[in-house]
Amino acid sequence: MLDLAKEFLLLGFLEETEEDGAVTYIMDFPDDTYVTVTDDNGRTPVRAKQNLVLACYDKEGCYLWGSEFKTFMELQKLCQDNPAGSPQLLQILKSASKTLKDSEWSSPSHP
């Protein structure tokens, strides 16, 4: 069984403990953005085989985009092939599985 706390640190994520004791995994990027990782309930991931949600924010904390992964191993593969905090990794994470902001939708009702 994977020790997810250790595995996130090995991938280059920082561990931040919130006031309520919840742990958030964060990776900073050079363009003043950062990515957080939670489970699909917004909590600290505890199992390798659970959905993970990545959310990217700007330096003011405004949501930019999100990606979803079915398992930690999917995320791990992308992170292992690219340097932590690199622009390349940020782009790959963004493109992996995107949850679009409303302003990015393109459809007949949203041209």
Predicted regions and their residues:
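Acidic, proline/glycine-rich low-complexity IDRs
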Residues: 77-111
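Short amphipathic alpha-helical segments that mediate assembly, nucleic-acid/protein binding
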Residues: 1-4, 68-72, 85-93
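Negatively charged, low-complexity tracts enriched in Asp/Glu with abundant Ser/Thr
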Residues: 1-32, 105-110
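Intrinsically disordered, low-complexity regulatory segments enriched in Ser/Thr/Pro
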Residues: 33-80
